[in-house]
Amino acid sequence: KWPWPRSVHAGLLEPLLAEKPRAVVFDIFFSDKDILRPDDDAWFGEILAAASNVYLAALQLGDAAVPTLLASYPAGAGLEPGPAARADARGSLLLPFAIPATAWRIGSVNFTPDPDGIGRGYDVYREIQGWRWSSLPLSLIHI
């Protein structure tokens, strides 16, 4: 659990966006709604919805997680079916569910470790049963 309320992020983001940065990236997972401070989530979500240059991290989870039909994820998840995409493809994604999906601009922060378990490279995109999911850095290339 992240210790700061979303009001901290919202309070940081408002003046930062006033400076017109090309992009702001949160490499933090906003996957759980704050049940104690829902107004903080709402404020943060409103700022994200109004800004087209704020990007959030997401993660493909391992096989132990309960998989969901990829086609059922919101469009904001950024999954793109390729020519070999299976209609019944499933995967488990940790998405920023604390934020309305209409405000999502996200990318995967997964990496594939080397045989010794150390991550020395970064996945440009994830291939999930014929579906492509862009990494967070790749998502930023288009700005």
Which residues fall in each region the model found?
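Non-transmembrane functional regions of envelope-associated proteins
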Residues: K1-I141
